Design a protein with these regions (language model features):
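Positively charged n-region of N-terminal signal peptides that target proteins for export
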Residues: 1-4
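Bacterial N-terminal signal peptides
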Residues: 7-16
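Structural preference for beta-rich elements and adjacent junctions enriched in aromatics
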Residues: 21-246
Length: 246
């Protein structure tokens, strides 16, 4: 009987360690978003010197967290801010850059894409979503609350004053060569994120997440900054934290 109890104890301990590892993998990452030193030109060229002072975020991971393979391709994401705007850049490693969706607010994630989710008020309720593909086609929307709380997406909403641009390092929709990837720059005015007259700049910490949908297989791969533990990014209380610093 003793050896069976010992075996059970070992299995239970292993399960506990596995659970702890999963819990640790779901701890929200924190990004210190620094003030921009100079003017940022939104042209998709992330190598510009104005991004030199922005620290890259931690590596993207599988949306499910620990125990799943690391993303096949690297994503380097940075953020900056000034008095008026939030700036986001991403460099996406991609050996075969492809995109088909061309119409604004069509379903961009049917292509490989880059996605931004912002909850400026830190309440894990109302949030904003931005997506783009390598053609620079934008899909943006407002969620009044998460789907799990009966939320509805408002596709007719657009970011007022949004600017974004994409640059392909290679060739688009040509699979007989090898590309480096593509990059995106985004400018979101703070006043586009105001809610009920409240200024989002008064909140020093935001909830946020960033994602890549990658069609290496079916179903697709989902690579994110802050894993949620399941294949569902619409869980704001599992997102990472942006801290605004001077």
């Amino acid at each position: 009987m003793g050896k069976y109890l010992l075996a059970f104890a070992v299995i239970a301990a292993f399960g506990s360690l596995e659970s702890l590892a999963q819990d640790a993998s779901l701890q929200p990452p924190v990004y210190d978003c620094h003030r921009a030193v100079g003017k940022i030109r939104i042209d998709g060229r992330v190598g510009d010197k104005e991004w030199a002072g922005a620290v890259p975020c931690s590596d993207f991971r599988d949306i499910r967290g620990a125990g799943y393979a690391a993303p096949k391709y690297l994503t380097t994401m940075r953020m900056l801010w000034d008095d008026d705007n939030l700036y986001i850049s991403a460099v996406l490693e991609e050996p075969d850059v492809k995109a088909q969706v061309k119409v604004r607010d069509d379903i961009v994630y049917h292509d490989n894409d880059f996605e931004v989710f912002l909850n400026p008020y830190g309440d894990s309720v109302l949030y904003y979503e931005y997506e783009t593909n390598a053609l620079g086609t934008v899909m943006d929307l407002l969620m009044d609350k998460p789907y799990s709380q009966g939320g509805t997406y408002i596709m007719t909403w657009d970011f007022p004053g949004l600017k974004s641009a994409v640059k392909v390092q290679g060739t688009l929709n040509r699979s007989n060569d090898t590309d480096k990837g593509w990059s995106v720059e985004i400018m979101i005015p703070f006043n586009a994120l105001s809610r009920g007259g409240a200024d989002p700049r008064t909140f020093k910490e935001w909830r946020a997440n960033f994602s890549r949908v990658e069609w290496l297989t079916k179903p697709e791969e989902n690579w994110v900054w802050s894993p949620t533990g399941v294949v569902d990014i619409h869980i704001p209380d599992k997102w990472g934290i942006i801290r605004f610093v001077d």
